[in-house]
Amino acid sequence: MHDIFKEIWTTITHNRLRTALTGFSVAWGIFILIVLLGAGNGLIHGIMGNRMKVLTNSMTIFGGETSKPHDGLGKGRSIELNDKDMDLTREGFAANVDDVGAELDKGGQTLVYADNYTTDINVSGVYPNDIDINKRDLLVGRFINPIDLNERRKSIVLSLNIAKELMPEAPLNLNGRLIKASDMAFKVVGIYDSDQSRVSNDAFIPFTTFRSIYNSGDKTGNIVFSFHGLNTEAENEAFEKAYRARINRQHRAATDDERTIWIWNRFTQDLQLNTATGLISTALWIVGLFTLLSGIVGVSNIMLITVRERTREFGIRKAIGASPWSILRLIIVESVVITTFFGYIGMVLGIAATQYMNATIGQTKVDNGLFSAQIFVDPTVSIVTCVQATVLMIVAGTIAGLIPARKAAKIRPIEALRAE
């Protein structure tokens, strides 16, 4: 075996430029594959991270407007959700709906504590289920509870960012104190963690308190609920169709009018995201494998050239008793050595590149003015995947070396000795 490697080393060093170019194509193939997979993972991790911020099996219903005349009423009529719609949701769909709530908002509010104040705050009237559906992280205190709701208490839950504005020196100590909102005194009952998004800077008060302060009547704003028993996209579509028809009928709109309400179904959105991330991963693997193919072709070509140049040598070997297997083994081992060595270099450089991406743009965020979200998180590839890609390249390189190796093994000594 030592003699084989010594002979391979002599052959490689004798054709340095050709070996270097072939090795570059192998290393480049592995490098590009790992970088592509890392970038894809960064995008997928960003999507998954944002998805985890809400309860998957939940829906939010928004009022819209009619798009067609019905029952003597014209199109373009606004649909405002109300208490009857909440009752219908709770009672008419009890087989699937768990916890029903609603949300009303009032923007541009000023909150004051002592000499500090913060402006342009969105105050939301919510039900207790809001914390579960939107997965808010409480740092201290509690969220709005049923007692707050029933007694219309002036309780308020702040984000950490708002608390820092009102009490910069010790924001968490604001819990349990009185602040002013809408010129009324509210007791801070909880402070939740801010995740840098606009939505996380809202202040929350009981839904019933909001109604009484802002005279909202029987309007509910958005209806929010969790559900169970809807496990496929088809089941969710059937539920949405039935729900829309019942709500439309209640508002004297056509049952098939899809613009009367907008349903944000986080479950179907989650299914679509899973499909999208799967397609992204598959597409990146396909592109990466085609890049690997260029390296494999390079290995095959250099082996064919090697066989052609050494035809006379192989003929002499066979004439003095060398077996076809020994020649076959020589070519295959040379192919494996080239792909292994340069494949390893490509793998190391690829890992280094993904680590650099992670250090520089691994926490990239997008901000559209309404919210900010991380879109590129941890763009790295596991060592297992890197090794698998390299092993795949080595196996492919071995197969690529088989064609010229078989050609070399079949050379007849007389024909080989006649070769130039």
Stretches found by the model and what they are:
Residues 1-13, 85, 89-90:
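A short amphipathic helical element positioned immediately N-terminal to and/or at the very start
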Residues 2-3, 405-420:
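Short cytosolic juxtamembrane segments of multi-pass membrane proteins
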Residues 6-9, 13, 17-25, 32-40, ...:
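Transmembrane alpha-helical interface segments in multi-pass membrane proteins
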Residues 41-122, 129-132, 212, 234, ...:
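Hydrophobic, regular-secondary-structure patches
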Residues 47, 237, 254-288:
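Peri-transmembrane interface segments
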Residues 51-52, 352-387:
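Short juxtamembrane loops and helix-capping segments at transmembrane helix boundaries
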Residues 129-144, 152-253:
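Mid-to-C-terminal secondary-structure elements
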